[in-house]
């Protein structure tokens, strides 16, 4: 969940004879990776926070030790099943993109953004610096290792090769670069980006990434050459205040950001920014009104639609003028020319957080934090329908992530 003004000591208050050889190797790698991915179960990860609560009187923190990560099997996309949980720290203080699965389906990465520290009867959020690595091919899935990254690791991105990952560190004002080989994940470098980094996303060619600079209301650009990553501060784009959600279309033409505004659930309409992302100099081409607090967004596998988790006023105290009991899911269409339109909306539960498309793109899943459920929505053309099916979860769903 977005937190404006997150000093470490403030309690939670709201919510390519060599060319041929290389070509053959590349083809072989593609075949192996594709086969591995095809054989891997269609899992989605859900981070379950057990230490931060949205009570009628306002937000409240509690002790550590009650978080977990759930593994959802979406073989039947209309009826996902929770098949396993692991007791691992994670937090709603990290954005709903603080976990993900490698393209071959082998590993899950989960950032632990904060831990709680007790002072008297109150619990205060303190930045953590850990990344959990889960072997999803093990039976049952198991924790392989925990890797140190930057302070308050938040959004995670994994490139299409599955060999490189980036972690946005909010309190660290940085992005950590990691290599992935088999089940081994290693930190290569941490890059200063100059502002709080809430989320990160790769361009499909892996040569560029984007980083959401939360408090600066900017989208940063990273250039990538192998494992060398450089922050291109001269290419920063103005998006919207509280930029939190971030996604790039599969063809790399368009990037979207969810801008939660100066304060979450304040009753004011917020925006999604549309970026033409494939030029030498990316540019913002539009801003769409989306409602109060677009917490997270996802782009369909075919790149034709995006779905947005809109909290509305559900994270506010019930006596607040901005309070609403429920959130919403908004559906956006993405045209071949890059034009983005809002085409549908459906009601959701209380304090919507993570949002992902099913592997086929026919369904959208959204986590309803307070309700402790996963909502299932059907996408047909430009329509979005609540199927009515809810997956009951053993904790509060703070994040969702797939491949």
Where do the protein language model's features map onto the residues?
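Bacterial N-terminal signal peptides
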Residues: 25-34
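Short, positively charged and aromatic/hydrophobic N-terminal segments
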Residues: 11-12
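Predominantly soluble domains enriched in secretory-pathway, periplasmic, or organellar proteins
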Residues: 37-403
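Positively charged n-region of N-terminal signal peptides that target proteins for export
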Residues: 3, 16-19
């Amino acid at each position: 969940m977005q937190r404006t003004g997150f000093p470490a000591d403030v309690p939670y208050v709201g919510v390519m004879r060599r060319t041929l050889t290389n070509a053959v190797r590349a083809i072989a790698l593609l075949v192996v990776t594709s086969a591995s991915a095809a054989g891997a179960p269609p899992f989605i990860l859900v981070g379950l926070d057990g230490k931060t609560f949205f009570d009628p009187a306002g937000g409240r923190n509690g002790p550590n030790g009650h978080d977990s990560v759930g593994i959802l099997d979406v073989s039947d996309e209309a009826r996902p099943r929770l098949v396993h949980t692991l007791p691992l720290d994670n937090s709603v203080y990290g954005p709903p993109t603080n976990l993900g699965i490698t393209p071959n389906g082998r590993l899950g990465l989960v950032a632990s953004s904060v831990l709680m520290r007790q002072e008297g009867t109150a619990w205060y959020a303190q930045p953590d610096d850990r990344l959990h690595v889960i072997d999803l091919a093990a039976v049952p899935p198991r924790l392989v290792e925990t890797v140190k990254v930057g302070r308050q690791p938040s959004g995670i991105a994994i490139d299409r090769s599955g060999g490189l990952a980036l972690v946005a560190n909010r309190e660290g004002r940085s992005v950590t670069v990691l290599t992935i080989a088999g089940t081994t994940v290693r930190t290569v470098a941490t890059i200063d980006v100059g502002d709080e980094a809430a989320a990160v996303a790769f361009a499909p060619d892996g040569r560029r990434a984007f980083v959401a600079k939360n408090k600066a209301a900017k989208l940063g650009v990273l250039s990538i050459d192998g494992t060398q990553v450089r922050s291109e501060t001269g290419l920063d784009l103005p998006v919207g205040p509280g930029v939190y959600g971030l996604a790039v279309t599969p063809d790399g033409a368009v990037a979207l950001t969810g801008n939660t505004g100066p304060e979450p659930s304040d009753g004011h309409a917020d925006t999604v920014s549309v970026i033409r992302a494939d030029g030498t100099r990316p540019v913002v081409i539009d801003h769409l009104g989306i409602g109060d607090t677009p917490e997270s967004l996802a782009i369909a596998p075919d790149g034709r639609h995006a779905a947005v988790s809109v909290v509305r006023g559900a994270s506010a105290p019930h006596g607040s003028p901005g309070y609403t009991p429920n959130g919403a899911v908004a559906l956006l269409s993405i045209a071949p020319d890059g034009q983005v339109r809002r085409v549908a909306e459906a009601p959701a539960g209380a304090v919507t957080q993570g949002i992902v498309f099913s592997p086929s793109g026919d369904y959208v899943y959204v986590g309803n934090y307070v309700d402790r459920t996963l909502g299932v929505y059907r996408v047909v053309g430009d329509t979005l329908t609540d199927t009515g099916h809810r997956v009951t979860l053993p904790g509060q769903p703070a994040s969702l992530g797939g491949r």
